[in-house]
Amino acid sequence: MKVASFICVAFVCSWAALAQDTTVPDERWPRQFDSGGNHFIIYQPQVDRWKNDRLEARSAVMVTQPGQATPAYGIVSLSARTAVDKESRTVALEDVNVVGATFPAAPSRQAYLADLIRKSLPDWPQMISLDRLLADIAITRAVSNGDNIQLKNEPPRIIVVTEPSVLILIDGEPVFRTVEGTSYRRVINTPALLLFEPLSNRFYLDGDRWWMTAASLNGPWSIATAPPADLARVKAELLEGEQQDPHAHIADLAQAPPTKVLVSTSPAELLVLQGQAQYLPIPTTELVYVTNTDRDIFMDVRSQMFYVLLSGRWFQAKSLQGPWSFVPGAKLPRDFSMIPPDSPKGYVLASIPGTEQAREAVIANQIPQTAEVRRSEPRLNVRYDGDPEFRPIEGTPMQYAVNADTDVILAESRYWACRNAIWFVSDAPQGPWEVTDYIPAEIYTIPPTSPVYRVRYVYVYGCTPDFVYFGYTPGYLGAFVSDGVVVFGTGWWYPGWYGDWWYGWPWTWGFGFRFSYWGGGWFWRPIAPYWWYHHTHATARFYYDHWNTHWRPGDREWIHNNVNVYNRWPQNSVRSRSYPTNPVSPVRPPVQAQPRRDLYAGRDGQIYQHRTDGWYQQNRSGVWNKVTPNPQLEQQRQSRSLGQERHDEFKNRGQVPGIPHTVAPRLPSRPVAPAHPPVPARHR
């Protein structure tokens, strides 16, 4: 269990506190610079431990003093506070301390050289690629495997169809509110624009370019060839106060209506096949996959069992029509772990325990996005639908607000609000609110059965009199570690609040979330390009992380753990990036022109060098002798190569070949829909 209880210090030495340059690149390693008349060459840090925002690492160094022809080779052990920016995939090293320094071939000068290292710290490289560190951690296992929490894995209602269909999700039984000045009643607990006209006893569903109609929510639905004349006006008035037009962000919305409309008042997933299932074999396995769908559907030829991957969880059935049951990833047929990474379905390896892809995903899920928040800003205003109403959090002495537009928790006789991964505190539920550097430890005991569970993944990492250092891991956005893999959503359905407003909670099912590697990171995304035609009729409000939601015309919905919610705050109050004020510029030609100088800091305190003909170790006389490396050294070399590859992928437009470059939207977590027109209105 992580507990965010911290002691503030009066001053934190941060190289990047006044940074202005947000384009500092991560240059190739090693780096070199001059300081105090000495020439330093620093090799890529090797991670020993990374927990919360504290990094412990080793770096091989070369120090050439004035008048010395031969450099001194050593190992520097460092600790630093990390400022992570997942959008730029960079890590700034701040408050760096030299824990120790050894120079095996120069023991008589070791103390002196260590002192030179400490004095040169202000000139050291202060930025490193996140992908380099993650690749190193994948080898060293320098972070934990996550909380491995127990989530709910019961299958949703899985609907398989072979014709163009759309799924309308309603948050429980439909709740109706009269549209002011009309005879229409709106179903407010769905993101779809769904109206009921009692005089004609007809339902009307907005399809952007058409209206569909039915006498019952269960259908059958058909095109309204002559919709009521006032429908267009009602729609325009309702959408006028919306945070976004639920259709505007999809430029390639289907030109024809779906054949079938399905309505579900419980969690559901829609699997659309273009006709009867068609299969292709996966090389080196006894598996086949369904090719005429954008879903991940497999069949094990030996057992004739079907498998489908939904929100990172596996379900199995003897028939595509079910019934489906959850199967732990560790109990999948062994052939799943043998799927070639470069096959069309290679990305599912991230959801198979024990694979390298799953380990990388788990590691990435532990790295926090960090921000420096000014205490005097930002401002928080919590909106309640009526008087504040609180309910108990199961298994704890705490309570949470059920009718607020923000996660508000009553703990230790005070009110704690978490919005956009910043914690606030107040003595009253309505405020006034102020940024806090203390979070009650019991908040980190909130169970997954609670709709405010996600706040457990927002932490305070430190503070000064003027700033608080916050961070959150992808759990805040709905990505959790369970049974050795990363899954999306807790699996629980949380009843929403229905008053003048509808306040809903995050959903796990209904959006076809797929976990795949893209542009240097693992990304959740809905798999269908047309969320209306092929998939679920819903705006982004049902997802996690909703504040200031927006879409851009033509974007495909890529949902990823690199979304930086701190960007929702004014830049003068929250700084989510930390960069050195004076980035280091090499004073000599880049060291990468010397490929033989590939140095590694061994855990045994020795310096190793990799050359084209193998590994060498420097003895106490300064002579390099060829050695047989231990497996860890070779793994370090491979991870360094992988880190460079991933770093280059991200630099090349943040794109993996064959996958379209897209823009990630802001992902909502608590859909809000007013039944009457308070401002700003959403669903009226």
Predicted regions and their residues:
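Bacterial N-terminal signal peptides
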Residues: 6-14
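Boundary at the C-terminal end of the N-terminal hydrophobic targeting segment
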Residues: 17-21
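Early extracytoplasmic/domain-onset interaction patches
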Residues: 24-60
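Short, low-complexity cationic-aromatic patches
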Residues: 185-208, 287-315, 398-424, 453, ...
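Extended intrinsically disordered, low-complexity coil regions enriched in Ser, Thr, Gly, Ala
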Residues: 203-233, 307-337, 419-420, 424-445
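Low-complexity, repeat-rich tail regions
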Residues: 233, 243-263, 291, 326, ...
